[in-house]
Design a protein with these regions (language model features):
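Residue-level signal for mature regions of secreted extracellular proteins and peptides
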Residues: 16-17, 89
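N-terminal low-complexity, Pro/Thr/Ser-rich intrinsically disordered segments
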Residues: 36-75
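Bacterial N-terminal signal peptides that target proteins for export
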Residues: 1-12
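A short beta-strand-turn-helix
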Residues: 68-86, 114
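N-terminal membrane-targeting/anchoring regions of envelope/secretory proteins
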Residues: 10, 15, 29-32
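Structural alpha/beta surface segment adjacent to cysteine/selenocysteine redox centers
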Residues: 84, 89-180, 246-253
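C-terminal motif of bacterial Sec signal peptides marking the signal peptidase cleavage site
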Residues: 19-22
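C-terminal cap of thioredoxin/glutaredoxin-like
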Residues: 24-43, 48, 91, 107, ...
Length: 253
């Protein structure tokens, strides 16, 4: 049972939050929920963390030179922010209602306050939960949008229309409609969606999440800390500010 708020030492546990704010894998085919929390990790703030969408680290497979280029472009397309800034890696599922809740309440403000300000570098990893019927197709389609440097626009559209996907059996037409809405090159997008290379990126994201014992969405690697759940923005800011302070203290030792 979720525990009530309590005081937490910043270097051991950034935040305690008493409501259910994350999608879990579920035991009987239905979504479970977990309590938002933050735990210390063991990564340097500005060096590549263990969860990172960079081709050299992910191991995504490329059978041809064209596939290799596709993977690199897709990987780069889901990064946002200065290269020397502290990493914040989001692990998410486009059909998870708590991921949408976090996105709708926090993403624009996070971009304004931290990404555009040069304080953090944002990356997105996919964890399409099996309880969400269309999450994998959405993840793969978003990486095809990333190839055209419109990952974040497509992610915005997927979260905006999340409810529409609940009532359709085949998501293909809806995925293409969203691609047209953001002016993607449609022949390229359609061809990309059949690419084994794109599938390998999403599959490898899942392997990375599993190896890091991430089982719920949204989860975030914030500098040295793993944060789980759709924290309110002010609490998420405190998590980032604490991680930034830890990184600064390490640099000045």
């Amino acid at each position: 049972m979720p525990q009530p708020r309590s005081a937490c030492r910043a270097t051991a546990l950034l935040l305690c939050f008493s409501v259910l704010t994350a999608c879990g894998r579920g035991d009987a085919g239905s979504a479970s929920a977990v309590t938002a929390k933050a735990e210390p990790g063991a990564v340097s703030a500005t060096t590549p963390p263990p969860l990172l969408p960079v081709t050299a680290l992910t191991g995504a497979t490329a059978d041809t030179l064209a596939d290799s280029v596709l993977i690199q472009r897709a990987d780069r397309g889901r990064l946002m922010g200065r290269e020397d800034a502290m990493w914040v890696v989001m692990i998410s599922d486009f059909q998870c209602p708590y991921c949408k809740q976090w996105h709708d309440s926090s993403m624009a403000r996070l971009k304004r306050d931290y990404i555009d300000a040069g304080k953090i570098r944002m990356a997105y990893l996919h964890l399409p939960l099996s309880i969400h019927q269309h999450a994998r197709a959405q993840a793969e389609a978003s990486m095809c949008a990333a190839v055209q440097d419109k990952f974040w626009d497509y992610a915005e559209a997927l979260f905006r229309d999340q409810r529409a996907f609940q009532s359709i059996e085949n998501p293909g037409a809806k995925l293409e409609q969203l691609a047209r809405d953001i002016s993607l090159d449609m022949p390229s997008f359609t061809k990309c969606r059949t690419s084994d290379a794109i599938r390998s990126i999403v599959a490898n994201d899942e392997r990375q999440a599993s190896q890091a014992r991430v089982q719920s969405t949204p989860s975030f690697l914030v500098g040295d800390f793993m944060v789980q759940g759709a924290l309110p923005y002010q609490d998420f800011r405190r998590a980032i500010d604490t991680a930034l302070a830890v990184a600064k203290a390490r640099r000045t030792r």
